[in-house]
């Protein structure tokens, strides 16, 4: 997608907290377009997607950067870096499609955009998704859900499944990491109407681990659809929270029990 460089609306159009763009001959181009920092053929359950084409493999790719600043980031080596500090390979949309097709012999069903925040590379994801979908293969997003409504609606027809991070169920938490709680909720609402959606909440001791917060989260998810799977994952010390203590396994199971009071499919993660 190219937008006139004189437009004041480009950043507001894309995300509440925008990605980086560069200007070339009055064309706005994201600096990470086609820059692949990580790629692997993964089990789809690893995304995690537990109730979508179980047993399948999917070509998983990621670039660099993120539109949030989570001090607990579990994948900070690529998500919390920039173009000047990333080792990447240029892969255009047609090359990615070819790679996905070649991996069919190993059980590949499509492409998952993951590892970093894929939607800061929105234009690349959209261009690739159209080709992949047209080839009869699956498109999966693993995202924090921080994207404005209009570009999300443009992308959703080409997406088959998503895992969306619901990092906490309070606005203050999102404000601290540079996000917007209501935007993420709206992304979940729209996405679950258009494709298969699963959610993940990483439980951090003392920050989003209260029973009342999990109860409110599960009840809200159930108000959309009781069959939306929720993954409640254990935090391990990482990045700026390397000094923290890992989440007690008992806490995870207690929160899972609470969530199961409202939802049909609740899973533990990292336990």
Task: Outline where the language-model segments fall.
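Conserved AdoMet/S-adenosylmethionine-binding subsite of the radical SAM
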Residues: 93-247, 255
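Glycine-rich active-site/cofactor-binding loop and its immediate structural neighborhood
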Residues: 54-64, 68-103
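Short, conserved glycine- and acidic-residue-centered signature motifs
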Residues: 54, 89, 180, 248, ...
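A C-terminal junction/extension of Radical SAM enzymes
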Residues: 236, 246-271
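Generic structural motif
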Residues: 23-24, 66, 204, 235
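Generic secondary-structure boundary/loop-capping signal
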Residues: 15-16, 26, 33, 38, ...
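N-terminal [4Fe-4S]-dependent radical SAM core
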Residues: 1-62, 76-80
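Short active-site-adjacent helix-start/loop capping segments
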Residues: 27-28, 68-70, 121-122
């Amino acid at each position: 997608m190219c937008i006139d460089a004189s437009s004041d609306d480009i950043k507001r159009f894309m995300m509440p907290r925008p990605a980086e763009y560069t200007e070339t001959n009055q064309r706005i181009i994201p600096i990470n377009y086609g820059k692949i920092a990580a790629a692997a053929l993964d089990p789809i359950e690893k995304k995690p997607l537990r109730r979508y084409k179980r047993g399948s493999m999917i070509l998983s790719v990621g670039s660099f950067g993120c539109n949030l600043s989570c001090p607990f980031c579990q994948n900070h080596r690529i998500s919390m870096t920039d173009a000047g500090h990333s080792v990447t390979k240029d892969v255009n949309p047609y090359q990615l499609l070819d790679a996905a097709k070649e991996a069919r012999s190993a059980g590949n069903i499509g492409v998952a955009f993951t590892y970093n925040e894929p939607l800061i590379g929105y234009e690349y994801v959209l261009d690739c998704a159209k080709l992949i979908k047209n080839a009869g293969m699956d498109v999966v997003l693993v995202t924090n859900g921080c994207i404005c409504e209009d570009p999300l609606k443009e992308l959703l027809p080409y997406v088959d499944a998503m895992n969306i991070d619901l990092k906490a169920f309070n606005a203050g938490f999102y404000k601290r990491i540079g996000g917007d709680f209501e935007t993420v909720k709206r992304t979940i609402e729209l996405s679950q109407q258009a494709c298969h959606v699963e959610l993940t909440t990483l439980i951090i001791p003392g920050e989003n681990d209260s029973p009342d917060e999990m109860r409110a989260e599960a009840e809200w998810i159930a108000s959309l659809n009781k069959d939306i799977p929720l993954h409640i994952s254990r935090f391990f010390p990482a990045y700026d929270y390397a000094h923290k203590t890992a989440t007690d396994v008992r806490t995870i199971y207690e929160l899972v029990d609470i969530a199961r009071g409202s939802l049909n499919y609740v899973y533990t993660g990292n336990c």
